[in-house]
Regions:
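N-terminal secretory signal peptides that target proteins for export/translocation
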Residues: 1-22
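N-terminal periplasmic/intermembrane-space "pro-region" immediately following the signal or transit peptide
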Residues: 2, 38-153, 202-205, 444-466, ...
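Sensor of tandemly repeated, compositionally biased sequence architecture
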Residues: 9, 21-22, 29, 77-85
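Intrinsically disordered and other compositionally biased segments
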Residues: 11-16, 25, 35, 51, ...
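Short, aromatic- and cysteine-enriched interfacial helices/patches
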Residues: 13-17, 47, 60-63, 120, ...
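Sec-dependent N-terminal signal peptides
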Residues: 20-47
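Outer-membrane beta-barrel pore domains
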Residues: 97-104, 144-145, 159-160, 204-207, ...
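Outer membrane beta-barrel
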Residues: 117-148, 158-340, 428-470, 477-490
Length: 560
């Protein structure tokens, strides 16, 4: 019997694929086409956003991708519609899909990707989910300054000098997931934001950077009696609201001076240790505490020469309305630690950086390397929001006990201080910032009662210029910040910084933004009157490097 029309072509294709000689370009082309269709949001059979099949099957594959961009698959809830089923809704209307599952992560980066349930037991407690994501931040910065900061390095000028640059600020790849309803894990590496250097100024290996280094690398167990969620591994310790907020959602290109001087000065804010987090059932009161290694490099998890560090944070949310669109948050945090190798260096870069940390970024204030027996820190947080307006402020204080000056490093880059080896007692440094933001397009920020920080902003209309889509221009956010750092205390004076940063953020989608910053910093700084020589420290003139520094920056940032 003769084949119906078209059957001969289908059989030819079947023979092509069954013969083992199918061309590689065909598979590659189909993969590229599928990826392109998913990226632009076109409905693809079996992918979120397509109409349900006539005979729904248990999903095995991608259940959701970038947060806010693609809807999750609808789980099959009924058999295939029969001829007696009611007709589908008219036009393009479809019944609402269920909300994506709640997923606890370090920065709400992406929604889960399901690889399948346990095929043997069918038990939800053994369901495994995995997420794959990353982020890229590309910066362009330019600077200008008055005479003082532009003096030579050995005459109290900025060290290193200012330099314009186009560079990657961060480039990370991340894989995290959950096993059952109690265990979750994360691993993330940054390929652009690390320099292999010691606290003592000089690099361990010259010209070694940027280097890939771990940020998140931890395992967490939830629902532990009394302790709540217990996390073990490389992580952020619970100290500081700005510190615990994801770099994906920062209001400015850089965090405050205090983040650089106190919170995460040389380890990028990630330290190895164990922590526990718990709170009331409604989330309005929460606490977190942990024990960590006091590292001085992003590679410190493999170096046991450091001291111990205990950190804790308590948060109270007296006002929480409309998912945090009206909010008042009050927090208090503390650290107590043994200085690594008995040495501490307080320093801060500016409100704009010209790429990854290390020898390319100018140091605005610097105490030099001090010795000490113990260090305590205190932090206070105040966060509020009302509709499109929000604000946050923090204060930090640091006490270094039994401090003394040292001759470690090039003394010419340190601030004014007595001769090396001079005991100076307790050194107290402090700083803080206050910032405010306003959505010009009317959006409001929501707040996570689980992690006690703002969620990722969601534009009302993502950027869409295609005539086949609903026209949208994203969200626009204006921001302003006052920034303060004082590294002056009695005998050891590393400098005083007062800064103002203005920002304009264009949120193209929930996962992509363009950031514009102008930073103005006034620096009060005098160099130390000592220099190293073969015979020991010798007196030299002290220079005045005070002045004003202007910075202009822009960033293209996206994560997936």
């Amino acid at each position: 019997m003769e084949d119906p029309a078209g059957n001969s072509k289908r059989r030819s294709l079947h023979r092509l694929f069954a013969s083992g000689t199918r061309p590689r370009w065909l598979a590659a082309g189909l993969t590229a086409l599928l990826a392109a269709l998913v990226a632009i949001g076109c409905p693809v059979s079996g992918i979120a956003g397509s109409p349900p099949a006539a005979e729904p099957r248990r999903p095995f594959g991608i259940a959701g991708v970038a947060e806010g961009m693609v809807e999750p698959l609808s789980p099959p809830s009924s058999p295939a519609p029969s001829s007696q089923s009611p007709p589908p809704p008219a036009g393009d209307e479809r019944p609402p899909l269920p909300s994506p599952p709640i997923w606890e992560g370090n920065g709400d980066e992406i929604a889960p990707v399901r690889f399948g349930d346990d095929p043997l037991h069918g038990d939800e407690s053994t369901t495994a989910t995995v997420r794959i994501g990353g982020l890229v931040q590309l910066d362009d910065t330019a600077y200008a300054a008055s005479a003082g900061p532009m003096q030579p390095i050995d005459q109290a000028g900025l060290a290193p000098p200012l330099s314009d640059a186009v560079n990657f600020r961060r480039a990370r790849l991340r894989v995290d997931g959950r096993r059952g309803d109690q265990f979750d894990w994360a691993t993330e590496y940054d390929f652009a934001n690390q320099i292999n250097a010691k606290n003592q100024i000089d690099p361990l290996f010259p010209s070694q950077g940027p280097l890939p280094a771990v940020t998140d690398l931890w395992l967490r167990m939830s629902d532990v009696p009394l302790l709540g969620a217990v996390r073990v591994g490389n992580q952020k310790d619970p100290f500081g609201y700005e510190h615990l907020s994801s770099c994906r959602t920062l209001d400015f290109m850089e965090r405050s001076f205090c983040q650089d001087a106190f919170v995460g000065p040389f380890n990028d804010g990630f330290v190895p240790g164990i922590s526990a987090r718990n709170g009331t059932a409604d989330g309005l009161l929460g606490w977190e505490a942990g024990e960590f290694a006091n590292t001085a490099a992003p590679f410190g998890f493999s170096d046991f020469a450091g001291g111990s560090m205990t950190s804790g944070r308590v948060v109270w949310v007296p006002t929480y309305e409309d998912d945090g669109r009206r909010l008042l948050h009050i927090g208090l945090a503390g650290r107590t630690m043994q200085p690594r190798n008995g040495l501490v260096r307080f320093r801060s870069r500016g409100g704009l950086w010209n790429g990854p940390p290390g020898p390319d970024n100018a140091i605005y204030a610097d105490s030099g390397v001090l010795s000490g027996s113990w260090q305590n820190m205190l932090g206070a947080e105040l966060v509020a929001s009302a509709g499109p307006w929000s604000m946050q402020a923090e204060y930090f204080g640091s006490w270094l006990y039994d401090a003394a000056t040292t001759d470690i490093g090039p003394l010419s880059t340190a601030g004014w201080q007595p001769p090396p080896g001079t005991p100076v007692g307790t050194v107290f440094y402090q700083g803080g910032y206050v910032e405010t933001t306003y959505f010009l397009t009317g959006e409001s920020r929501t707040y996570s009662l689980l992690e006690h920080r703002f969620d990722r902003p969601q534009p009302r209309h993502i950027l869409a210029l295609s005539p086949h889509r609903t026209r949208g221009f994203g969200a626009w956010q204006a921001a302003a910040r006052y920034n303060y750092l004082c590294l002056n205390d009695t005998q050891v004076n590393g400098g005083l910084l007062n800064g103002m940063t203005l920002g304009l953020n264009w949120l193209l989608t929930p996962n992509a933004r363009i950031v514009f910053n102008y930073d103005l910093t006034h620096r009060e700084y005098r160099s130390t009157p000592w220099a190293n020589s073969p015979s020991g420290p010798v007196p030299v003139p002290s220079y005045n490097g005070s002045g004003t520094i202007h910075g202009f920056g822009s960033r293209l940032a996206f994560d997936f």
